Regions:
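Tandem repeat scaffolds
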Residues: 1-126
């Protein structure tokens, strides 16, 4: 198992070149965080709040992102292969490359219990 940072207030934290694979960040507050060149593969991010965060080259592969909030975030070169995004809110989030957003639309479902936003709607899925 990875680090246990569940429920932690990590607002405005700066994380670079970290391996947080299998970490528990459930319900962590990562509001306005800057996260770069970091892996969160197989991590528990259930209910984590990434509002207005700036990420670059980050991997969420096979992570649990259920009910996570990414509102207003910038997700550049983010990878979500096999991630569970049920109930996640991506409203006003810039996801690059665009093909990543399209891949997320293929698996998007649910409604975020905090914001009340439908995941597919927040991604702009057709």
């Amino acid at each position: 198992m990875g680090a246990d940072l569940s429920g932690q207030d990590l607002q405005e934290v700066q994380i670079s070149y970290c391996n947080l694979d299998q970490a528990n960040l459930a319900d962590a507050k990562l509001i306005q965080a800057s996260i770069q060149h970091t892996t969160l593969n197989n991590a528990n991010l259930h209910g984590a709040d990434f509002t207005n965060s700036d990420t670059y080259n980050i991997s969420f592969n096979h992570a649990d992102l259920t009910d996570a909030i990414f509102t207003g975030s910038l997700l550049q070169r983010a990878s979500f292969d096999g991630a569970n995004i049920t109930g996640a809110d991506f409203s006003s989030t810039l996801i690059q490359p665009v093909r990543q957003r399209l891949k997320l639309c293929d698996v998007a479902s649910g409604v975020n219990p905090t914001t009340g936003v439908v995941t597919r709607d927040s991604l702009g899925c057709w």
